[in-house]
């Protein structure tokens, strides 16, 4: 690995292209890619001057010339391909959501434990520059204890494009709830520094007519005592100013508005003026996917532990299942996280 860790990309669509560009920026050597669609496989291979391109993911993950693979696949393929890659001695980065079920996520975690290889989930929002700045401010105690948060990711018309698997829950794990909601909830658990213990949620599908939810609103409670609201949509008839992404943190001594045109802003001084004074926060230079891949490389090198590793993926899928149980039953669901990889369910 002295000349750079050798990486293969499984899935040559837009996400695979983003992974390839970020991995190259992070210092990986891009060796090969796999995809069943010849045109996009050829385009990715040509753009990044890959030595090999194959149609079969299994062939790629068993290539002895690779140290790691990045999986940019339909969600139902994450588990079988990740397990094959781990057994073949590869470290694995997997796009979100982790799997279609917590059982599948546990299977990945068990295999990672047995093989001693790294699994990292692409919770890329944790690595954004604004999010990193907010996390640093929170960890340094500038805001005090967090008691509430609000997060939204609202698209007016933004149903994922593809071959239709996004709208088949057996293939995707769900609709907007897992596609947009899970990354936002993961970000909140990261910022608050606490696991979700209870979830209550509702969903709607009034615009697209899809068989999965296009809108989800949830209320979360955390071990720390904090609460949070999360709203996400693929397609929503809304006032233009509502569209986009927001994340606002309310704490004992300050409030944080993470997504503003000026970048993340912390409001302090409420006790003196009754209205907080905004102060823009400094942001790191490297963010998003490049920061994610640098973290992946450091995990492989043994310099740090995965920020969202195999066990975290199990927790995320348990949370997703609780979200859907609440939607189906109309009840608040308690989450008792069980990540014991020795058990199959």
Q: Predicted regions span which residues?
A:
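Contiguous beta-strand/loop segments that form the cofactor/metal-binding neighborhood of enzyme cores
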Residues: 186-263, 290-303, 336, 340-345
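Predominantly a Rossmann-like dinucleotide-binding segment in NAD(P)-dependent oxidoreductases
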Residues: 125-210, 330
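Rossmann-fold dehydrogenase core element
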Residues: 106-125, 145-149
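Hydrophobic residues in well-ordered beta-strands that form the structural core
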Residues: 94, 119-121, 150, 230, ...
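Beta-loop-alpha module in the N-terminal Rossmann-like domain of NAD(P)-dependent dehydrogenases
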Residues: 19, 48-111
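C-terminal helix-rich "cap/oligomerization" subdomain common to oxidoreductases
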Residues: 1-4, 68-71, 117, 223, ...
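N-terminal Rossmann-like dinucleotide-binding module
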Residues: 1-48
């Amino acid at each position: 690995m002295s000349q750079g860790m050798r990486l293969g990309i499984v899935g040559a669509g837009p996400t695979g292209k983003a992974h390839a560009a970020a991995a190259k920026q992070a210092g990986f050597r891009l060796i090969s890619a796999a995809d069943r669609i010849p045109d996009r496989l050829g385009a990715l291979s040509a753009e990044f001057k890959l030595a090999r391109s194959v149609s079969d993911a299994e062939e790629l993950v068993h290539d002895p010339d690779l140290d790691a693979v990045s999986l940019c696949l339909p969600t139902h393929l994450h588990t079988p391909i990740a397990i094959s890659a781990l057994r073949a001695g590869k470290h694995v980065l997997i796009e979100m959501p982790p799997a279609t079920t917590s059982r599948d996520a546990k299977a990945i975690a068990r295999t990672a434990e047995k093989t001693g290889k790294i699994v990292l989930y692409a919770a890329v929002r944790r690595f954004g520059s604004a999010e990193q700045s907010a996390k640093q401010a929170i960890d340094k105690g500038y805001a005090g204890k967090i008691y509430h948060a609000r997060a939204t990711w609202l698209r007016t018309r933004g149903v994922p494009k593809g071959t239709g698997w996004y709208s088949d829950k057996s293939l995707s794990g769900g609709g907007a709830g897992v596609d947009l909601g899970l990354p936002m909830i993961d970000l909140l658990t990261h910022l608050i520094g606490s696991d979700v213990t209870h979830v209550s949620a509702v969903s709607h599908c009034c615009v697209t007519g899809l068989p999965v939810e296009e809108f989800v609103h949830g209320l979360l409670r955390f071990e720390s005592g904090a609460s949070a609201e999360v709203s996400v949509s693929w397609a929503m008839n809304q006032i233009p100013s509502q569209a986009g992404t927001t994340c606002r943190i309310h704490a004992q001594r300050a409030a944080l508005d993470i997504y503003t045109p000026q970048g993340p802003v912390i409001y302090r001084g409420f006790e003196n003026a009754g209205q907080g004074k905004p102060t823009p926060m400094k942001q790191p230079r490297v963010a998003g996917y490049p920061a994610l891949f640098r973290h992946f490389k450091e995990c492989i090198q043994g310099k740090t532990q995965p920020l969202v590793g195999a066990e975290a993926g199990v927790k995320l899928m348990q949370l997703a299942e609780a979200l859907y149980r609440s939607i189906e039953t109309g009840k608040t669901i308690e989450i008792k996280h069980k990540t014991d990889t020795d058990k199959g369910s």
